[in-house]
Amino acid sequence: MAALMESVVGRALKFSSTANFRSIRRGETPTLCIKSFSTIMSPPSKAIVYEEHGSPDSVTRLVNLPPVEVKENDVCVKMIAAPINPSDINRIEGVYPVRPPVPAVGGYEGVGEVYAVGSNVNGFSPGDWVIPSPPSSGTWQTYVVKEESVWHKIDKECPMEYAATITVNPLTALRMLEDFVNLNSGDSVVQNGATSIVGQCVIQLARLRGISTINLIRDRAGSDEAREQLKALGADEVFSESQLNVKNVKSLLGNLPEPALGFNCVGGNAASLVLKYLREGGTMVTYGGMSKKPITVSTTSFIFKDLALRGFWLQSWLSMGKVKECREMIDYLLGLARDGKLKYETELVPFEEFPVALDKALGKLGRQPKQVITF
């Protein structure tokens, strides 16, 4: 009997998180009160994965993933929406400096709803809206399981397209406005790539600070419409590259002050135009290179204008242990979006139509709004 009891207790302890013995009196049979638990599993998930690096339209595919255990410190999130960013494409191509090992699930930011939580999780409940903050790879799937520390709870009243896209691009715009030059109300900035999400955010965030923006766009079909859209966001001046074929581009500024700060995400001639606008001692910050052309700077720009060239990479900034600061800024940006003070173009695309969204994100169909997958 003793051996049998030891065997029962041993098995119970093996499969139970806690075991409580009742106090017994002489002649009573000891009983064991067991608090049982069952393993929490996520539902099966559908995901966009790539098993090798290459062109995204060739190496990505939709797969079914099995359920994943939700451990004691984990949160299982049912994804609501996730964007396709240029950095996502670069990761798949294998040219981004930081990328997950393959095979990998695509995506780096997004918004989801808490589906289940581990036994030690106290900060989240099913139904909460959350985003990975700082961003975390693997958001192009229907269910994501990651540790509690990865997730940041947000206001559910913010439109999902902004919640899904608030980190990578709007946060880049905010940091660049604050980290390089001490700007005051009445100052101005100049940027190329003004129709990008970062560009649109720069216009609106600068305007909230009383800072004017000079915006450069490419000559292409729809440029007049793009100019009007940027003006509606608060852009002070919008020029196409062909309008800048003048001897002194600063003559186009009118009453605007010469900018002390410029942003470049294109490279090539578009970067040179930004440099021409900068005042003596000005700074150009490069955060992208969409044209894949190098930046050429004249010797006179350095000697006679003392210009400074800097770079910004959000991933590097986030790696400096700034989780708290990151989340505070995200809440600020989400508040602006919720109140209609921060807007940008997005297109919601059902998960089943991912190939179409990818083609648009790759530029195969001309200029398109930010593609946001909905699950």
From Swiss-Prot:
Keyword list, A-Z: Fatty acid biosynthesis, Fatty acid metabolism, Lipid biosynthesis, Lipid metabolism, Mitochondrion, NADP, Oxidoreductase, Transit peptide
EC number: 1.3.1.104
One GO location term (cellular component): mitochondrion
SUPFAM superfamilies to which the protein is assigned, alphabetical: GroES-like (SSF50129), NAD(P)-binding Rossmann-fold domains (SSF51735)
Membrane spanning residue stretches: none
Transit peptide, start-end: 1-37
Annotated InterPro entries: ADH-like_C, ADH-like_N, GroES-like_sf, Mito_Enoyl-ACP_Reductase, NAD(P)-bd_dom_sf, PKS_ER
Record flagged with keyword Cytoplasm: no
Catalytic activity: a 2,3-saturated acyl-[ACP] + NADP(+) = a (2E)-enoyl-[ACP] + NADPH + H(+)
One of the GO biological process terms: fatty acid biosynthetic process
Sequence positions that bind NADP(+): 169, 195-198, 218-220, 287-290, 312-314, 370
Compartments reported by the entry: Mitochondrion
Active-site residue list: 96 (proton donor)
Molecular functions per Gene Ontology: ATP binding; copper ion binding; enoyl-[acyl-carrier-protein] reductase (NADPH) activity; enoyl-[acyl-carrier-protein] reductase activity (NAD(P)H)
Family, as annotated: Belongs to the zinc-containing alcohol dehydrogenase family. Quinone oxidoreductase subfamily.
Quaternary data: Homodimer.
Physiological role: Catalyzes the NADPH-dependent reduction of trans-2-enoyl thioesters in mitochondrial fatty acid synthesis (fatty acid synthesis type II). Fatty acid chain elongation in mitochondria uses acyl carrier protein (ACP) as an acyl group carrier, but the enzyme accepts both ACP and CoA thioesters as substrates in vitro.
Protein name stated in the entry: Enoyl-[acyl-carrier-protein] reductase, mitochondrial
Native species: Arabidopsis thaliana (Mouse-ear cress)
